[in-house]
A protein has these predicted regions:
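N-terminal strand-loop element at the rim of the active site
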Residues: 2-53, 143-146, 159
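Donor nucleotide-sugar binding/catalytic pocket of nucleotide-sugar-dependent glycosyltransferases
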Residues: 40, 126-169
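Glycine-rich phosphate-binding loop signature in dinucleotide/nucleotide-binding domains
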Residues: 65-71
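Short His-centered aromatic/hydrophobic patch
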Residues: 75-81, 101-102
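Active-site proximal beta-strand in glycosyltransferases
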Residues: 72, 90-108, 136-137, 155-158
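Short acidic, glycine/proline-rich loop/turn micro-motifs
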Residues: 109-113
Length: 169
Protein backbone atom coordinates (compact mmCIF):
# COMPACT_ATOMS: atom_id res chain seq x y z
CA UNK A 1 0.00 0.00 0.00
CA UNK A 2 2.95 2.30 0.51
CA UNK A 3 3.68 1.64 -3.17
CA UNK A 4 0.42 3.35 -4.20
CA UNK A 5 1.29 6.43 -2.18
CA UNK A 6 4.79 6.70 -3.63
CA UNK A 7 4.19 5.71 -7.25
CA UNK A 8 0.85 7.24 -8.13
CA UNK A 9 0.33 9.98 -5.54
CA UNK A 10 3.77 11.53 -4.97
CA UNK A 11 3.39 14.02 -7.84
CA UNK A 12 0.11 15.30 -6.44
CA UNK A 13 1.50 15.64 -2.92
CA UNK A 14 4.69 17.31 -4.18
CA UNK A 15 2.76 19.99 -6.08
CA UNK A 16 0.40 21.13 -3.33
CA UNK A 17 2.38 23.48 -1.14
CA UNK A 18 -0.31 24.94 1.11
CA UNK A 19 -1.13 21.65 2.83
CA UNK A 20 0.72 19.03 4.82
CA UNK A 21 0.20 15.40 3.95
CA UNK A 22 0.43 12.41 6.27
CA UNK A 23 0.69 8.87 4.91
CA UNK A 24 -1.00 6.17 6.98
CA UNK A 25 -0.49 2.74 5.44
CA UNK A 26 1.12 -0.63 6.06
CA UNK A 27 4.81 -0.24 5.22
CA UNK A 28 6.34 -2.65 2.75
CA UNK A 29 9.44 -1.45 0.93
CA UNK A 30 8.81 2.27 0.44
CA UNK A 31 8.93 3.70 3.97
CA UNK A 32 11.99 5.86 3.28
CA UNK A 33 10.60 7.13 -0.03
CA UNK A 34 7.28 7.99 1.67
CA UNK A 35 9.22 10.24 4.02
CA UNK A 36 10.50 12.23 1.04
CA UNK A 37 6.97 13.29 0.05
CA UNK A 38 4.84 13.22 3.19
CA UNK A 39 5.18 15.43 6.27
CA UNK A 40 4.56 12.42 8.50
CA UNK A 41 4.35 8.68 7.89
CA UNK A 42 2.63 6.20 10.17
CA UNK A 43 2.92 2.44 9.80
CA UNK A 44 -0.59 1.03 10.01
CA UNK A 45 -0.01 -2.42 11.50
CA UNK A 46 -2.38 -4.55 9.45
CA UNK A 47 -2.37 -8.17 8.36
CA UNK A 48 -3.37 -7.69 4.73
CA UNK A 49 -3.83 -11.43 4.24
CA UNK A 50 -6.87 -11.42 6.51
CA UNK A 51 -10.23 -10.37 5.12
CA UNK A 52 -11.15 -8.71 8.41
CA UNK A 53 -8.22 -7.90 10.70
CA UNK A 54 -9.69 -6.87 14.07
CA UNK A 55 -6.29 -5.80 15.46
CA UNK A 56 -5.59 -3.80 12.30
CA UNK A 57 -8.88 -1.96 12.78
CA UNK A 58 -8.06 -1.30 16.43
CA UNK A 59 -4.61 -0.02 15.43
CA UNK A 60 -6.13 2.33 12.83
CA UNK A 61 -8.67 3.56 15.37
CA UNK A 62 -5.79 4.56 17.67
CA UNK A 63 -4.10 6.40 14.80
CA UNK A 64 -7.17 8.38 13.64
CA UNK A 65 -8.40 9.37 17.11
CA UNK A 66 -5.99 12.32 17.11
CA UNK A 67 -7.20 13.77 13.81
CA UNK A 68 -9.20 16.99 13.95
CA UNK A 69 -11.79 18.88 11.91
CA UNK A 70 -9.15 20.54 9.71
CA UNK A 71 -7.98 17.15 8.48
CA UNK A 72 -9.08 15.46 5.27
CA UNK A 73 -8.75 11.69 5.19
CA UNK A 74 -8.36 10.29 1.67
CA UNK A 75 -8.66 6.51 1.70
CA UNK A 76 -7.60 4.40 -1.30
CA UNK A 77 -9.14 1.01 -2.11
CA UNK A 78 -12.48 -0.41 -1.07
CA UNK A 79 -10.93 -2.72 1.54
CA UNK A 80 -9.09 0.17 3.23
CA UNK A 81 -12.30 2.21 3.13
CA UNK A 82 -14.30 -0.48 4.86
CA UNK A 83 -11.58 -0.99 7.48
CA UNK A 84 -11.48 2.79 8.04
CA UNK A 85 -15.28 2.87 8.40
CA UNK A 86 -15.17 0.10 11.02
CA UNK A 87 -12.33 1.91 12.84
CA UNK A 88 -14.43 5.07 12.81
CA UNK A 89 -17.45 3.25 14.27
CA UNK A 90 -18.90 4.91 17.40
CA UNK A 91 -16.57 7.89 17.00
CA UNK A 92 -17.70 11.47 16.72
CA UNK A 93 -16.27 11.90 13.23
CA UNK A 94 -14.56 15.27 12.96
CA UNK A 95 -12.75 14.84 9.65
CA UNK A 96 -13.81 15.12 6.03
CA UNK A 97 -13.44 11.67 4.50
CA UNK A 98 -13.00 10.75 0.85
CA UNK A 99 -12.88 7.21 -0.52
CA UNK A 100 -11.25 6.44 -3.87
CA UNK A 101 -12.36 3.02 -5.04
CA UNK A 102 -9.60 1.86 -7.37
CA UNK A 103 -11.46 -1.37 -8.15
CA UNK A 104 -14.16 -3.45 -6.51
CA UNK A 105 -11.78 -6.30 -5.73
CA UNK A 106 -12.43 -9.54 -3.90
CA UNK A 107 -15.80 -8.60 -2.42
CA UNK A 108 -17.32 -8.27 -5.90
CA UNK A 109 -15.56 -11.26 -7.46
CA UNK A 110 -17.22 -14.50 -8.55
CA UNK A 111 -15.64 -16.35 -5.62
CA UNK A 112 -18.27 -18.21 -3.56
CA UNK A 113 -16.84 -17.04 -0.21
CA UNK A 114 -16.77 -13.45 -1.48
CA UNK A 115 -20.44 -13.66 -2.48
CA UNK A 116 -21.39 -14.88 1.02
CA UNK A 117 -19.24 -12.18 2.63
CA UNK A 118 -20.84 -9.55 0.40
CA UNK A 119 -24.30 -10.61 1.59
CA UNK A 120 -23.23 -10.70 5.26
CA UNK A 121 -21.51 -7.30 5.10
CA UNK A 122 -24.23 -5.63 3.03
CA UNK A 123 -26.10 -4.16 5.99
CA UNK A 124 -22.91 -2.71 7.51
CA UNK A 125 -21.55 -1.40 4.23
CA UNK A 126 -24.76 0.48 3.46
CA UNK A 127 -24.65 2.25 6.80
CA UNK A 128 -20.92 2.69 7.23
CA UNK A 129 -20.16 4.05 3.76
CA UNK A 130 -22.96 6.62 3.95
CA UNK A 131 -22.02 7.64 7.50
CA UNK A 132 -18.27 7.89 6.99
CA UNK A 133 -17.56 9.27 3.52
CA UNK A 134 -18.38 12.73 2.24
CA UNK A 135 -17.87 11.58 -1.33
CA UNK A 136 -16.60 8.65 -3.34
CA UNK A 137 -14.28 8.66 -6.34
CA UNK A 138 -13.99 5.88 -8.89
CA UNK A 139 -11.73 5.12 -11.81
CA UNK A 140 -14.52 3.81 -14.02
CA UNK A 141 -18.24 4.25 -14.44
CA UNK A 142 -19.14 0.57 -14.10
CA UNK A 143 -17.63 0.38 -10.60
CA UNK A 144 -19.39 3.64 -9.70
CA UNK A 145 -22.77 2.29 -10.80
CA UNK A 146 -22.26 -1.13 -9.18
CA UNK A 147 -21.02 0.10 -5.81
CA UNK A 148 -23.37 3.08 -5.51
CA UNK A 149 -26.32 0.74 -6.15
CA UNK A 150 -25.03 -1.94 -3.75
CA UNK A 151 -24.23 0.50 -0.94
CA UNK A 152 -27.23 2.76 -1.58
CA UNK A 153 -24.71 5.61 -1.39
CA UNK A 154 -26.58 8.91 -1.14
CA UNK A 155 -23.63 11.32 -1.39
CA UNK A 156 -21.74 12.65 -4.38
CA UNK A 157 -19.48 10.42 -6.42
CA UNK A 158 -17.07 11.23 -9.23
CA UNK A 159 -15.00 9.56 -11.92
CA UNK A 160 -11.28 10.40 -11.83
CA UNK A 161 -8.45 9.42 -14.20
CA UNK A 162 -6.85 6.06 -13.48
CA UNK A 163 -3.59 5.86 -11.59
CA UNK A 164 -1.69 4.91 -14.71
CA UNK A 165 -1.89 1.14 -14.63
CA UNK A 166 -3.01 -0.22 -18.00
CA UNK A 167 -5.50 -3.06 -17.81
CA UNK A 168 -6.00 -5.26 -20.87
CA UNK A 169 -9.64 -6.03 -21.57
Amino acid sequence: WDWILTQSRKDIVSNINDSKFMAICPFDQNEIELGNYYKETIDWKLNRNKIFDFWGIKNLRNIIKDLNSDDIVHVFTLKSGLLFAFANLFRNNKTKNILTITGLGYLFSDNFKAKILKILLGFFIKRLVNKNFDFLMYQNGEDQKTFNNYSKYNGESFIIPTSGITVKE
